[in-house]
Amino acid sequence: SAKKIISEHYQFTDRRRHGMPGNLDKRQTLLQNLKRNMLKGKPGVHDFKDEDLRYRVPDVYYERTTNAVVYLMMDWSGSMTTQKKFIAKAVCFWIVRFLRLKYTAVEVVFIAHDTEAEIVSEQDFFGRSEGGGTRCSSAYTVALQHTIQYYPTSLFNVYLWHFSDGDNIYDDNTVCKERIEDLLRECTMVGYGEIKWEHSALAPSNLLHALKNINHPRFLTTILRTKDDVHAALKAFLGAEIGVV
C-alpha cells in the first residue's frame, strides 16, 4: 500500500483585530472603516483608527498525502534503435500519467546507460543515442544510490522501470539481479521491459533469463515486440496498482 506522510498546511479563514502586519486584510479593514464612518453619519473611507484594522489569522491543519518518485531507465547502446525507443517512450508516458493520477506529487528521474549510466534530462532521455556495449547494472547502481540519498522509503513510494533489448554484457547479468534485489528493499515496485522489435531476435535475452530467477511479488517483467504490446505492458506493470484494464 502507498506510504502516507503528514503535511502541515495553513488556511486563512478567520479575521481578528490584532495580528502580524504582513497579515493585514486591507479589504476587511476598508469595510470596517466605511461601516464605522457610516454609523457616525460621515460616509466614506477616511480617518482610520486601530479599531478598523483586521488581520488574517492562519488555521493550521494536517493532511495525509502520498508522494511518489519514478525512475525511468533506458538502454542507450547502439542496438537500441529508433523503433525500440518509440515503444519505450510510449510506455514511459503512460506510466507517469497514471501515477500522477494516483499520487499527490510525482517526481521523475531519467537514467540512461550504455556501459555507464547517468541521470539525464527528459529531452536527452528520448533524443540521444550512444554506441558501444551495454552494462545494465550501471543504471541500477545509479538508481539505488540516488534513491537512498534523496528519496527515503519512509517518505516516498519509489517506482523503477528499466527498458532494454537485453543485449547485455554476459557477466553483468548476475550483477543486475543482485542490484534489483537491493532495489526491492527500497522500491514499491521494480519493472523490466525487454523490447524486441519485429526484425530483431524474438527469443528472451540471457539478461531476462537471469532476472526470471528473482522471485518477488513486486518485481515484474514483460516483453514488447510491437507498438501493440504497449497496453499489455501497462497491464503487467500497473494493473495491480491502479486497475489498468
For the regions a language model picked out, list residue spans one by one:
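Acidic/polar low-complexity segments with low predicted structural confidence
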Residues: S1-T66
